[in-house]
Design a protein with these regions (language model features):
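A nucleotide-sugar donor-handling region in carbohydrate enzymes
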Residues: 53-120, 243-247
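Active-site and donor-binding regions of nucleotide-sugar-utilizing enzymes
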Residues: 1-74, 80
Length: 248
């Protein structure tokens, strides 16, 4: 469930049997519907609502948020839509695009700055230079995708630093090959600013993923990535924390 100002209006029956809400903006509407339905509407909320958990029938929250309760279902990482079928379909659709790249092929998922991380032009240059060095030293090809959050100056810096590298770079023009890159990759490198991207990379299951750290990790993302910094029960997620350069 989401909310849109253009769709605002009075709440009226018939009331749904179930509401699945996500994010804090949807909570007020979901709880209002539950009250008006005299409790006949159940609410499943995705993510930590950051309020009293008792009004919800179920809260699905990632382990690194650190919340507990009888109505809390703990997830490892974030919920996402990555499935083997989706990856295989996307890979089949896009398989000719990176066909000129050498193998092994590395998918590189680039996020962007947020309230806790900085991914500016200088950071983009550093990451891309390390990627170019990795590609040249291992003979690998790079399938690079940026996101809507990637600053244009960082995109330009990444393109410039990878100009002579065996790389295919998508930066917002045309159809997004994100899931195809995940499906076609032999390895995955993802910037550590987004729990969603890291979770999606880890969920591919077949290949080892590497998290490229950025500056100023907040507490909850530190908690999210901490189990992957050393061997342990997260090994089945096939992700590892890169503590230094992107060396083979």
């Amino acid at each position: 469930m989401g909310t849109r100002p253009s769709a605002s209006g009075p709440l009226a029956p018939p009331w749904p049997a179930l509401i699945v809400s996500c994010g804090r903006r949807s909570i007020g509407t979901a709880l209002a519907i539950k009250r008006r339905s005299a409790g006949r509407t159940s609410i499943v909320h995705i993510q930590n609502p950051r309020m009293d958990l008792r009004p919800f029938d179920l809260v699905a929250a990632p382990e690194h948020d650190g919340i507990t309760g009888e109505n809390v279902a703990i997830t490892t990482g974030s919920l996402h839509g990555v499935t083997r079928a989706k990856l295989d379909d996307a890979a089949a659709h896009w398989q000719s695009r990176p066909s000129h790249l050498p193998t092994p092929r590395i998918a590189v998922l680039i996020g962007g700055s947020n309230s806790a991380y900085r991914l500016d032009a200088a950071t983009g240059t550093r990451i891309a230079q390390e990627l170019a060095s990795l590609a040249h030293s291992t003979g690998a090809g790079l399938m690079v995708t940026t996101s809507r959050r990637t600053d244009p100056t960082a995109v330009a810096a990444i393109r410039a630093a990878l100009e002579d590298a065996p790389a295919e770079i998508w930066s917002g023009d045309g159809e997004n090959p994100y899931f195809a890159y995940l499906g076609l990759a032999d390895r995955i490198i993802v910037t550590g600013d987004s729990v969603n991207m890291v979770s999606e990379a880890a969920a591919t299951g077949r290949f080892r993923s590497f998290i490229c750290p950025l500056l100023a990790a907040p507490r909850n993302l530190n908690a999210f990535t901490a189990p992957w910094k050393t061997p342990g029960p997260r090994a089945n997620l096939r992700a590892r924390w890169l503590t230094g350069n992107l060396t083979p």
